[in-house]
UniProtKB/Swiss-Prot annotation:
This is Large ribosomal subunit protein eL22. GO terms for molecular function: RNA binding; structural constituent of ribosome. It comes from the Eukaryota. The gene is rpl22. The keyword Manganese does not apply. Keywords: Cytoplasm, Ribonucleoprotein, Ribosomal protein. Transmembrane segments: none annotated. GO terms for biological process: cytoplasmic translation. PANTHER family: 60S RIBOSOMAL PROTEIN L22, LARGE RIBOSOMAL SUBUNIT PROTEIN EL22. It is found in: Cytoplasm.
Amino acid sequence: MAPLKKPAVKGGKKKKQVLKFTLDCTHPVEDGIMDAANFEQFLQERIKVNGKAGNLGGGVVSIERSKSKITVTSDIPFSKRYLKYLTKKYLKKNNLRDWLRVVANTKESYELRYFQINQDEEEEEDED
């Protein structure tokens, strides 16, 4: 009996992986304590591609802003955690870290929320 030949598997090209992350800054922007355009500029200056900040890899990473939402799109591997790190760095720089926190509301997005301050109300009730 003749040996069976396995059919040749053609190696197709991998699909280009496009990563899209969203940062929702609606609450602080509406309250006027944060400027979305300033935050967008901060991200453009700080995001590193191939170890270099500020160049965004010649178009492989793009940042778009629509009102108070910032969208970061990347053709190369890009960490959502890195986006959170940069957001926290921006908040610290602008002295907003004490009032705002970065929360993941979906798998592809973060949201800036205020800290819930319920402890002060409970302490006041206990003193009565």
